[in-house]
């Protein structure tokens, strides 16, 4: 090795050699790691190593913080802790796969002197913005600290090549190991205890900032049996049932709701805690549910982080697991039956028919495997004389390699984290449309033979996954930015697309194959003063069409919106839980809502930003709670017994302009009250002065 310089390639070689030695004799893991660390400190190019260390450390210190826990100091952490620096970006499916491992490391090792720091390293323009990263942190409930490398200065200096990447630092910010890619990052945890043993005299093993805010084990056990209050966040997908009801999945609150088209909620499915429990709807658990589709009066659910397909039967009011083991799969062929078959990050679903015998199959966009899979409800014939066995699940489109290659042989084509999938018609032929998110394109699959082609977006180079933008047009000249949803309107022969990272809707006219931005007019008459314009979107995701209406999950706004396709108008859907069957608290009660209106340049402080208390006319507390930065513009606070006479809401909150924060307090009177709801508005005027 050239000892005149020390760089990331040096660490790649050292880490690879160490992993090879451990693979040959895993029983000597601790010995290998200890010997490696001793040699690292005794290298004859220590001056170059120190310079390499200092350059990385100084660049990290310049990054903007996005999410920090109480007491966290970046500089002190690097001197006193073992730091697991996790280079990730929230659009990347492989980064998502490793999040449970990083959260587990934070939970198990934070008291022992290990700190996890997420270094968000964006691919897309949309991902550079602090507010969008915060939404991703909140949706995924990330407990560790996150900083923003929005210019990729640390990413480039380290020489990162792939998401995710982990760089482990010893005390005094000395880089020790580098793990690149999903298959290698999973080794991170087995290295930590040997590292701690080696540096036990140098590491401050006091509780880290993230552990300070953790609840006790008794609290966790108690919470498991108690459904969370119905605060539905980060809606992801929707479907309309045969009897005209709307089902919505909420990735942030790990629940589904089944409601009438007018918003009256029939069922809330799931207790809101991330997990994989089957059973009755009050006890069932999901983990980031996404795509939905109905078949034979049951609703099929892509339970993404559980790597499973679940089934909700509204008649029995129960949920069971159909496909998946609950663990991340790596199989790219499949063929096993039901819950024996491991899968990876299913994202969306659609029901279609075999082109040969017209039997029904469930199609799954498997974002984690860059493929489309099929589940056969009964034995059926498929392309290339393949027989799909009853209850078996297997890959039918995509080699499993990430890419943008079109091919007449479906298993030779490559996809890039396919998300939305739907049926449609093109040139008179039944087809599938796929929102191929990481190639920023829409792909078309001819159902007759599996031929995979491009519709819009992407690039002619099958390895170019950075051909994104925001441009109307046809074919490769049209540009999208990480689209996540597709829905076909048969009456007008239009394909509607959620161009997610452009915060827009687009549509493709099947007669001209031209893609254009689709703008709508807000006619929402129920909007409160200061509420967002319903025609503005923030990471729109799933969408579904029912008659001439299109429903859209506007994820980061935590709204469901309804568009009248005949008139190009939009309203926000509002949900009435007053008669929900499985919410015992809703009987004889009304929902209390709060909206907070701030001056344009202000925002609520990150994390816990204040408290609220609702009192009766005698000044006695009816209910109370905390305010957080991530609550939507109109938040459901609690349920209030209808016999209570509400006088006002008292509040204390902290608002910030840049780095200057001010504590505000006061009272808010109800602005609207009916038998089912009571609404409050806190309006904050421009403060005269700010203090830190």
Positions of predicted regions on the chain:
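Structural microenvironment flanking redox-active thiols in thiol-disulfide oxidoreductases
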Residues: 97-139, 150-155
